[in-house]
Amino acid sequence: MTGTLAHRGLTVFLLLAAFSINAKERVIIDTDPGVDDSQAILFAIASDKIEVVGLNSIFGNVDTGLATRNALRLLDLVDANIPVASGSVRPLYAKKLPTPTFVHGKDGLGEIWVPESSRAALDLTAAEFIVETVMSNPGEISLIALGPMTNIALALALEPRLATNVKRIVAMGGVLAVPGNVSPVA
């Protein structure tokens, strides 16, 4: 349990510490909502320093379909009208790892009951949503990668100028000194 709590705390710390104190940062969160990412998403939405302009789903803690459903369910819980785009269902090159149901439960949210959402994800893919949003707001949108970075790689393949138009990319990218995201693809 200590490793899991440390992992959650590190995720939230990295998310909030990455942004300046004075400016409200506009972000797209690219996420595989398990219990840890769900907490980070809710903290970001509640923060007066962050404006979440979109959520993208990705495989990782759960499969992409469930990640999309979980993102929509979380947004309904807090009555947040934020668009959700469904992302890649597999890595570009590496073998897809099994989902850690022993940590996040079969539903990805720790087996707590959260009502299904009546909302749907955008018709755009996550990569298309990233490109459209960043290129329409050059230098204003940051990307927060809480899961695998496949959607960001696909967005860069669609629009190489994305690299010079995104404000910054903040990636969780693994853990230190605790069990967790310590694999060759973390």
Residue ranges and their predicted role:
Residues A85-S117:
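Surface-exposed loop and adjacent secondary-structure segments within mature catalytic domains
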Residues G9, F13-L14, T64:
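Contiguous, function-dense segments enriched for cysteine-driven chemistry
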Residues L14-N22:
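Hydrophobic h-region of N-terminal signal peptides that target proteins for export
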Residues V78-A85:
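A glycine-rich helix N-cap at a beta->alpha junction
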Residues K24-D30, V35-R73, K106-G108, I112-A186:
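Active-site histidine-anchored catalytic micro-motif
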Residues M1-L10:
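Bacterial N-terminal signal peptides that target proteins for export
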